């Protein structure tokens, strides 16, 4: 049984994230979506909210589990007996950071592979940062996130649906 971990801040979970989860869940026996605490990123949603959002969006996948974590990714990977780390690459700008991170993870976890997936064409430009900014400024994010995520955003911002 091959277990993979897909770590991220998921602030919020977008259609691009779900696209990668859907595709990775078809490759691995079990996919653990690791929602990172990431206090240095100053997330818009709390860790508990981000876990709740991810569980709402991904709850229909039978082999996907959503867990929060803080600390080193290597510890989360080991605690879940994972053999693969899944990462998404939207553009060349993501590659340099992800390449360095994969190298560090290989050093810390020599028996764990990093697998890069690119999003489907319609999701290549979506980022949580863009979604939050558009939502805060009153724009329509319905093409980028699921209805439940849009509701979470509207509640957090304090705007009616």
UniProtKB/Swiss-Prot annotation:
Family per UniProt? Belongs to the bacterial CoaD family.
Q: Where in the cell is it found?
A: Cytoplasm
* Annotated ATP binding sites: 9-10, 17, 88-90, 98, 123-129
Look at the named UniProt entry and state the broad enzyme category this protein falls under: transferase
PANTHER family referenced in this protein's UniProt entry, alphabetically: PHOSPHOPANTETHEINE ADENYLYLTRANSFERASE
Q: Look up the EC number in the record and give it.
A: 2.7.7.3
- This protein is called Phosphopantetheine adenylyltransferase
Per the record, the domain of life is: Bacteria
Chain's role: Reversibly transfers an adenylyl group from ATP to 4'-phosphopantetheine, yielding dephospho-CoA (dPCoA) and pyrophosphate.
What GO cellular component entries does it have? cytoplasm
Which gene is annotated as encoding this protein in its UniProt record?
coaD
Q: How does it assemble?
A: Homohexamer.
Note whether Cytoplasm occurs among the keywords.
yes
**GO molecular function annotation:** ATP binding; pantetheine-phosphate adenylyltransferase activity
* Key words, A-Z: ATP-binding, Coenzyme A biosynthesis, Cytoplasm, Magnesium, Nucleotide-binding, Nucleotidyltransferase, Transferase
Q: Known SUPFAM superfamilies for this protein?
A: Nucleotidylyl transferase
| CDD domains for the chain | PPAT (cd02163)
Annotated GO biological process: coenzyme A biosynthetic process
Q: Which amino acid positions bind substrate, per UniProt? A: 9, 41, 73, 87
Site Transition state stabilizer: give positions. 17
Q: Which cofactor does it need?
A: Mg(2+)
Listed pathway(s): Cofactor biosynthesis; coenzyme A biosynthesis; CoA from (R)-pantothenate: step 4/5
Return the InterPro entries for the record.
Answer: Cyt_trans-like (IPR004821), PPAT (IPR001980), Rossmann-like_a/b/a_fold (IPR014729)
């Amino acid at each position: 049984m091959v277990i993979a971990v897909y770590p991220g801040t998921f602030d919020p979970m977008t259609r691009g994230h779900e696209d990668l989860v859907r595709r990775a869940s078809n490759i691995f026996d079990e996919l653990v979506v690791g929602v990172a605490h990431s206090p240095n990123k100053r997330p818009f949603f709390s860790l508990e909210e981000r876990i709740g959002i991810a569980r709402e969006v991904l709850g229909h996948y039978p082999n996907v589990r959503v867990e929060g974590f803080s600390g080193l990714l290597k510890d989360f990977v080991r605690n879940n007996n994972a053999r693969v780390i899944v990462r998404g690459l939207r553009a060349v700008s993501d590659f340099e950071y992800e390449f360095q991170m994969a190298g560090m993870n290989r050093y810390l976890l020599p028996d764990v592979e990093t697998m890069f997936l690119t999003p489907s064409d319609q999701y290549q430009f979506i980022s949580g940062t863009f979604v939050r900014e558009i939502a805060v400024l009153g724009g329509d994010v319905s093409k980028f996130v699921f209805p439940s995520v849009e509701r979470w955003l509207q509640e957090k911002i304090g705007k009616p649906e």
